């Protein structure tokens, strides 16, 4: 006898007869409720642009961080449950530091994404052999990793299933479907960094419900000459004027 749909819904480590893990699928759907984040990789560097949702005038916008530094050569943008994102970002930072201490070299972006994905898939009904408690559900967050490795810009995407893939351009979050289509139409492998910034902001402008301004968007660039660099409000405003 097969279990009912609701029973497969509750089990995070039980496949349905169709070969599906419903809790992982639901976690992926949860990301579509999060703010939109866009990453574009160019020969000059990588751009991350993220929507910041200020849900109350009493909130302090500067405390809502959507783009964070993992290491000097790796930054990431997240969409989904922020509490889950902080846990995964903390793991990424620890792994990068451990790699530096042990091997005296920077961790590759792919290895960093792989280390985070290893934690992301450690959900189930029992703990591991070391006695650590297992998580009761998948992480409801997707991450865009942007970095420089051997002088080459890279962009990686990881979702709640633990799958991590390298991209030329990628959109996640509530406006990801429309944004992804726009990126497919406009992306070229030979884009300049400024063109990528304008495309990312223009794409956010199309999918965001609010009017684009320097308060509700964050922009970060990663280049060989200047690694993790967060744009100031004035710089963001200038680029918004360029696409007006």
From Swiss-Prot:
Subcellular localization, per the record? Cytoplasm; Nucleus
UniProt cross-references to SUPFAM superfamilies, sorted A to Z: N-terminal nucleophile aminohydrolases (Ntn hydrolases) (SSF56235)
Q: Record's superkingdom?
A: Eukaryota
Its main subcellular localisation, reduced to a broad class, is cytoplasm
Cellular component (GO) terms are:
cytosol; nucleoplasm; nucleus; proteasome complex; proteasome core complex; proteasome core complex, alpha-subunit complex
Q: Name one GO biological process term.
A: determination of adult lifespan
Against Pfam families, the record matches this protein to: Proteasome, Proteasome_A_N
Keywords attached to this Swiss-Prot or TrEMBL record, sorted alphabetically, are:
Cytoplasm, Nucleus, Proteasome
Which InterPro entries does the record cross-reference, listed alphabetically? Ntn_hydrolases_N, Proteasome_alpha, Proteasome_alpha-type, Proteasome_alpha_type_5, Proteasome_asu_N, Proteasome_sua/b
Question: Do you know which CDD domains this protein is assigned to?
Answer: proteasome_alpha_type_5
Q: Which family does it belong to?
A: Belongs to the peptidase T1A family.
State the NCBIfam families in the record.
PRK03996.1 (NF003075)
- Tell me, in a sentence or two, what this protein's role is: The proteasome is a multicatalytic proteinase complex which is characterized by its ability to cleave peptides with Arg, Phe, Tyr, Leu, and Glu adjacent to the leaving group at neutral or slightly basic pH. The proteasome has an ATP-dependent proteolytic activity.
User: How does the annotation summarize its subunit structure?
Assistant: The 26S proteasome consists of a 20S proteasome core and two 19S regulatory subunits. The 20S proteasome core is composed of 28 subunits that are arranged in four stacked rings, resulting in a barrel-shaped structure. The two end rings are each formed by seven alpha subunits, and the two central rings are each formed by seven beta subunits. The catalytic chamber with the active sites is on the inside of the barrel.
Q: What is this protein called?
A: Proteasome subunit alpha type-5
